[in-house]
Amino acid sequence: MHYTNMEIFPVFGISKISNFIANNDCRYYIDVEHQKIISDEINRQMDETVLLTNILSVEVVNDNEMYHLIPHRLSTIILCISSVGGCVISIDNDVNDKNILTFPIDHAVIISPLSKCVVVSKGPTTILVVKADIPSKRLVTSFTNDILYVNNLSLINYLPSSVFIIRRVTDYLDRHICDQIFANNKWYSIITIDDKQYPIPSNCIGMSSAKYINSSIEQDILIHVCNLEHPFDSVYKKMQSYNSLPIKEQILYGRIDNINMSISISVD
Protein backbone atom coordinates (compact mmCIF):
# COMPACT_ATOMS: atom_id res chain seq x y z
CA MET A 1 0.00 0.00 0.00
CA HIS A 2 1.36 3.43 -0.91
CA TYR A 3 0.26 6.54 0.94
CA THR A 4 0.04 9.97 -0.58
CA ASN A 5 1.45 13.04 1.10
CA MET A 6 -1.74 13.78 3.07
CA GLU A 7 -2.87 10.44 4.52
CA ILE A 8 -2.74 9.82 8.26
CA PHE A 9 -2.36 6.29 9.59
CA PRO A 10 -2.12 4.65 13.04
CA VAL A 11 1.25 3.62 14.44
CA PHE A 12 1.67 0.80 16.94
CA GLY A 13 4.32 -0.13 19.47
CA ILE A 14 5.46 3.42 20.20
CA SER A 15 4.62 3.39 23.94
CA LYS A 16 8.34 3.29 24.78
CA ILE A 17 8.86 6.46 22.74
CA SER A 18 5.83 8.18 24.29
CA ASN A 19 6.96 7.31 27.83
CA PHE A 20 10.48 8.57 27.17
CA ILE A 21 9.22 11.91 25.84
CA ALA A 22 6.76 12.30 28.74
CA ASN A 23 9.52 11.75 31.31
CA ASN A 24 12.34 13.69 29.69
CA ASP A 25 12.51 17.38 28.97
CA CYS A 26 14.44 17.29 25.71
CA ARG A 27 13.98 19.08 22.42
CA TYR A 28 16.29 16.93 20.31
CA TYR A 29 17.71 13.47 20.93
CA ILE A 30 19.29 10.47 19.24
CA ASP A 31 18.09 6.95 20.04
CA VAL A 32 18.80 4.04 17.71
CA GLU A 33 16.04 1.90 19.23
CA HIS A 34 13.44 4.64 18.79
CA GLN A 35 14.57 5.14 15.21
CA LYS A 36 14.12 1.45 14.50
CA ILE A 37 10.63 1.41 16.03
CA ILE A 38 9.57 4.29 13.79
CA SER A 39 11.29 3.06 10.64
CA ASP A 40 9.86 -0.47 11.03
CA GLU A 41 6.36 0.98 11.29
CA ILE A 42 6.81 3.27 8.29
CA ASN A 43 8.40 0.47 6.26
CA ARG A 44 5.34 -1.66 6.98
CA GLN A 45 2.98 1.10 5.89
CA MET A 46 4.96 2.11 2.79
CA ASP A 47 6.11 -1.38 1.75
CA GLU A 48 9.56 0.02 0.97
CA THR A 49 12.80 0.69 2.81
CA VAL A 50 12.69 4.01 4.66
CA LEU A 51 15.84 5.51 6.20
CA LEU A 52 15.55 8.04 9.03
CA THR A 53 18.01 10.79 9.86
CA ASN A 54 19.67 10.52 13.27
CA ILE A 55 18.01 13.40 15.11
CA LEU A 56 14.51 13.05 16.56
CA SER A 57 12.86 16.40 17.26
CA VAL A 58 10.24 16.88 19.99
CA GLU A 59 7.88 19.82 19.46
CA VAL A 60 5.30 21.04 21.98
CA VAL A 61 2.41 23.02 20.54
CA ASN A 62 0.45 24.88 23.22
CA ASP A 63 -3.19 26.05 23.24
CA ASN A 64 -4.20 27.69 19.95
CA GLU A 65 -0.59 27.77 18.76
CA MET A 66 0.82 26.56 15.46
CA TYR A 67 3.87 24.54 14.46
CA HIS A 68 5.17 25.37 10.98
CA LEU A 69 7.24 22.82 9.10
CA ILE A 70 9.82 24.37 6.80
CA PRO A 71 9.74 22.70 3.35
CA HIS A 72 12.67 20.30 2.94
CA ARG A 73 14.17 18.17 0.17
CA LEU A 74 13.68 15.07 2.31
CA SER A 75 10.34 13.66 3.43
CA THR A 76 9.23 14.41 6.99
CA ILE A 77 7.48 12.00 9.35
CA ILE A 78 5.36 13.54 12.11
CA LEU A 79 3.94 11.45 14.97
CA CYS A 80 1.30 12.74 17.36
CA ILE A 81 2.55 11.62 20.79
CA SER A 82 -0.02 13.32 23.03
CA SER A 83 -2.75 15.92 22.74
CA VAL A 84 -5.23 17.52 25.13
CA GLY A 85 -8.17 18.83 23.14
CA GLY A 86 -6.91 17.50 19.83
CA CYS A 87 -5.11 19.06 16.89
CA VAL A 88 -5.38 19.35 13.14
CA ILE A 89 -2.73 19.32 10.43
CA SER A 90 -2.73 21.32 7.21
CA ILE A 91 -0.59 20.04 4.32
CA ASP A 92 0.08 22.04 1.17
CA ASN A 93 2.31 20.73 -1.63
CA ASP A 94 2.03 24.07 -3.48
CA VAL A 95 0.47 22.49 -6.59
CA ASN A 96 -3.24 23.08 -5.88
CA ASP A 97 -3.31 20.26 -3.37
CA LYS A 98 -4.10 21.43 0.17
CA ASN A 99 -5.64 19.25 2.87
CA ILE A 100 -6.71 19.89 6.46
CA LEU A 101 -7.09 16.76 8.59
CA THR A 102 -7.66 15.77 12.20
CA PHE A 103 -4.41 14.44 13.68
CA PRO A 104 -5.17 11.84 16.42
CA ILE A 105 -2.79 10.54 19.09
CA ASP A 106 -0.64 7.53 18.07
CA HIS A 107 -0.97 8.42 14.41
CA ALA A 108 1.63 9.49 11.89
CA VAL A 109 1.68 11.45 8.68
CA ILE A 110 4.31 11.50 5.95
CA ILE A 111 4.97 14.92 4.45
CA SER A 112 6.39 14.80 0.94
CA PRO A 113 9.51 16.80 0.03
CA LEU A 114 8.99 20.55 -0.52
CA SER A 115 5.49 20.44 1.01
CA LYS A 116 4.34 23.00 3.56
CA CYS A 117 2.77 21.81 6.79
CA VAL A 118 1.13 23.44 9.81
CA VAL A 119 0.01 21.69 13.01
CA VAL A 120 -2.68 23.65 14.88
CA SER A 121 -3.36 22.70 18.49
CA LYS A 122 -6.66 23.03 20.36
CA GLY A 123 -4.80 22.10 23.57
CA PRO A 124 -1.26 21.15 24.64
CA THR A 125 0.07 18.79 21.97
CA THR A 126 3.40 16.96 21.64
CA ILE A 127 4.62 15.78 18.26
CA LEU A 128 7.76 13.94 17.18
CA VAL A 129 9.37 15.08 13.93
CA VAL A 130 12.04 13.25 11.93
CA LYS A 131 13.38 13.59 8.39
CA ALA A 132 13.38 10.47 6.20
CA ASP A 133 14.63 9.23 2.85
CA ILE A 134 11.70 7.47 1.18
CA PRO A 135 12.53 5.98 -2.25
CA SER A 136 9.10 6.63 -3.78
CA LYS A 137 9.24 10.29 -2.73
CA ARG A 138 12.84 11.17 -3.63
CA LEU A 139 13.26 14.31 -5.70
CA VAL A 140 14.73 13.75 -9.15
CA THR A 141 16.46 16.40 -11.28
CA SER A 142 18.27 15.59 -14.51
CA PHE A 143 19.36 17.68 -17.49
CA THR A 144 19.94 15.89 -20.78
CA ASN A 145 19.22 16.51 -24.48
CA ASP A 146 18.37 20.17 -23.76
CA ILE A 147 15.59 19.09 -21.38
CA LEU A 148 15.37 19.58 -17.63
CA TYR A 149 13.61 16.54 -16.14
CA VAL A 150 12.06 16.58 -12.66
CA ASN A 151 9.56 14.41 -10.82
CA ASN A 152 8.04 17.27 -8.82
CA LEU A 153 6.53 20.38 -10.43
CA SER A 154 7.72 22.53 -7.53
CA LEU A 155 11.26 22.10 -8.87
CA ILE A 156 10.65 24.07 -12.07
CA ASN A 157 9.12 27.28 -13.33
CA TYR A 158 7.59 26.65 -16.70
CA LEU A 159 5.88 28.20 -19.70
CA PRO A 160 3.23 26.21 -21.61
CA SER A 161 5.43 26.25 -24.73
CA SER A 162 8.23 24.39 -22.99
CA VAL A 163 6.76 21.73 -20.70
CA PHE A 164 5.46 18.18 -21.08
CA ILE A 165 4.85 15.00 -19.06
CA ILE A 166 6.44 11.72 -20.05
CA ARG A 167 5.28 8.48 -18.44
CA ARG A 168 6.30 4.85 -18.76
CA VAL A 169 3.84 2.09 -17.97
CA THR A 170 4.93 -1.48 -17.18
CA ASP A 171 3.03 -4.48 -15.92
CA TYR A 172 3.37 -6.05 -12.49
CA LEU A 173 6.37 -8.07 -13.72
CA ASP A 174 8.08 -4.91 -15.06
CA ARG A 175 7.36 -5.78 -18.69
CA HIS A 176 7.01 -2.68 -20.86
CA ILE A 177 3.45 -1.77 -21.87
CA CYS A 178 3.79 1.71 -23.36
CA ASP A 179 5.31 5.18 -23.13
CA GLN A 180 2.97 8.16 -23.15
CA ILE A 181 3.51 11.90 -23.38
CA PHE A 182 1.21 14.72 -22.26
CA ALA A 183 1.46 17.88 -24.35
CA ASN A 184 -0.96 20.37 -25.89
CA ASN A 185 -3.31 19.51 -23.02
CA LYS A 186 -3.85 15.91 -24.09
CA TRP A 187 -2.25 12.48 -23.85
CA TYR A 188 -0.42 10.75 -26.69
CA SER A 189 0.83 7.19 -26.88
CA ILE A 190 4.27 6.88 -28.47
CA ILE A 191 4.38 4.33 -31.27
CA THR A 192 7.22 3.16 -33.52
CA ILE A 193 7.00 3.36 -37.33
CA ASP A 194 10.09 2.47 -39.38
CA ASP A 195 12.38 2.85 -36.37
CA LYS A 196 11.05 6.32 -35.54
CA GLN A 197 8.78 7.27 -32.66
CA TYR A 198 5.57 9.22 -33.22
CA PRO A 199 2.93 10.64 -30.82
CA ILE A 200 -0.59 9.35 -31.48
CA PRO A 201 -3.52 10.94 -29.57
CA SER A 202 -4.66 8.49 -26.91
CA ASN A 203 -6.40 8.08 -23.61
CA CYS A 204 -4.26 7.88 -20.50
CA ILE A 205 -3.55 4.17 -19.97
CA GLY A 206 -4.73 3.35 -16.47
CA MET A 207 -4.69 5.63 -13.46
CA SER A 208 -1.99 8.30 -13.32
CA SER A 209 -0.38 10.24 -10.47
CA ALA A 210 0.68 13.06 -12.82
CA LYS A 211 -0.25 16.62 -11.90
CA TYR A 212 -2.09 18.59 -14.58
CA ILE A 213 -0.04 21.11 -16.57
CA ASN A 214 -0.98 23.64 -19.26
CA SER A 215 1.10 22.67 -22.28
CA SER A 216 1.53 23.88 -25.88
CA ILE A 217 4.37 22.34 -27.91
CA GLU A 218 4.95 22.52 -31.67
CA GLN A 219 4.54 19.24 -33.54
CA ASP A 220 8.14 18.99 -34.79
CA ILE A 221 9.48 19.52 -31.28
CA LEU A 222 7.01 17.00 -29.89
CA ILE A 223 8.15 14.34 -32.38
CA HIS A 224 11.78 15.13 -31.57
CA VAL A 225 11.10 14.69 -27.85
CA CYS A 226 9.39 11.35 -28.49
CA ASN A 227 12.61 10.07 -30.08
CA LEU A 228 14.85 10.92 -27.13
CA GLU A 229 15.96 8.64 -24.32
CA HIS A 230 14.31 9.77 -21.10
CA PRO A 231 15.92 9.15 -17.66
CA PHE A 232 13.32 6.71 -16.34
CA ASP A 233 16.01 4.75 -14.50
CA SER A 234 16.08 7.50 -11.87
CA VAL A 235 12.32 7.41 -11.21
CA TYR A 236 10.56 5.16 -8.69
CA LYS A 237 7.82 2.91 -10.06
CA LYS A 238 4.45 3.63 -8.46
CA MET A 239 1.60 1.16 -8.42
CA GLN A 240 -1.53 2.13 -10.35
CA SER A 241 -4.36 0.13 -11.91
CA TYR A 242 -5.74 -0.49 -15.39
CA ASN A 243 -9.03 -2.36 -15.83
CA SER A 244 -8.63 -3.62 -12.25
CA LEU A 245 -5.16 -5.00 -13.08
CA PRO A 246 -2.03 -3.73 -11.31
CA ILE A 247 0.40 -1.69 -13.40
CA LYS A 248 3.46 0.39 -12.57
CA GLU A 249 3.94 4.00 -13.59
CA GLN A 250 6.97 6.27 -13.84
CA ILE A 251 6.35 10.00 -14.25
CA LEU A 252 8.71 12.78 -15.33
CA TYR A 253 7.99 16.43 -16.08
CA GLY A 254 10.19 17.92 -18.79
CA ARG A 255 11.04 21.56 -19.50
CA ILE A 256 12.52 22.17 -22.94
CA ASP A 257 15.37 24.59 -23.65
CA ASN A 258 13.59 25.89 -26.74
CA ILE A 259 16.55 27.68 -28.32
CA ASN A 260 18.95 24.74 -28.14
CA MET A 261 16.16 22.31 -29.00
CA SER A 262 15.37 24.27 -32.20
CA ILE A 263 19.04 24.22 -33.17
CA SER A 264 19.18 20.47 -32.53
CA ILE A 265 16.10 19.83 -34.67
CA SER A 266 17.44 21.97 -37.54
CA VAL A 267 20.69 19.99 -37.48
CA ASP A 268 18.78 16.70 -37.57
From Swiss-Prot:
Superkingdom assignment: Viruses
Any Pfam family hit: DUF1235
Alphabetical UniProt keywords: Early protein
Record-linked InterPro entries: Vaccinia_virus_A37
Induction annotation: Expressed in the early phase of the viral replicative cycle.
Sequence similarity: Belongs to the orthopoxvirus OPG165 family.
Protein name according to UniProt: Protein OPG165
Species, as recorded: Monkeypox virus
Taxonomic classification: Viruses, Varidnaviria, Bamfordvirae, Nucleocytoviricota, Pokkesviricetes
